[in-house]
């Protein structure tokens, strides 16, 4: 699966639903501006991330997820979860040669952590 992050202009224009339909994507949560699709989407209006793993959000789950993936360089994105990414980064075992994106959000109302790879 893939997570799609719309450009800020799309969000401000409230065209997320239209963009989702155009690309065969669906909203991850009715109140969050992230979409999901079964295949990668190439659009200048979207940033696409390939999902590597998804777990319920907790510090314990995120720490285990990052440690197992041997991630040394981590981009943290968040929507709908009240957390300070810089503070979270300081608690994670960032050891390894891999790089990834951690997306913290709500999926159908549930706090979720998604480890993903940003696509070009």
Please annotate each region the language model reported.
Residues 1-120:
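SAM-dependent transferase fold signal centered on methyltransferase-like domains
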């Amino acid at each position: 699966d893939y997570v799609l992050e719309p450009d800020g202009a799309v969000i401000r224009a409230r065209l997320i639903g239209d963009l989702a339909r155009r690309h065969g994507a669906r909203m991850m949560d009715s109140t969050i501006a992230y979409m999901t699709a079964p295949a990668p989407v190439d659009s200048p209006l979207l940033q696409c991330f390939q999902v590597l793993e998804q777990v319920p959000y907790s510090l314990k789950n995120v720490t285990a997820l990052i440690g197992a993936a041997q991630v040394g360089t981590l981009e943290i994105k968040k929507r709908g979860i009240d957390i300070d990414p810089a503070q979270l980064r300081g608690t994670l075992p960032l050891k390894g040669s891999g790089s990834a994106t951690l997306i913290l959000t709500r999926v159908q109302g549930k706090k979720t952590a998604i480890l993903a790879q940003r696509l070009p």
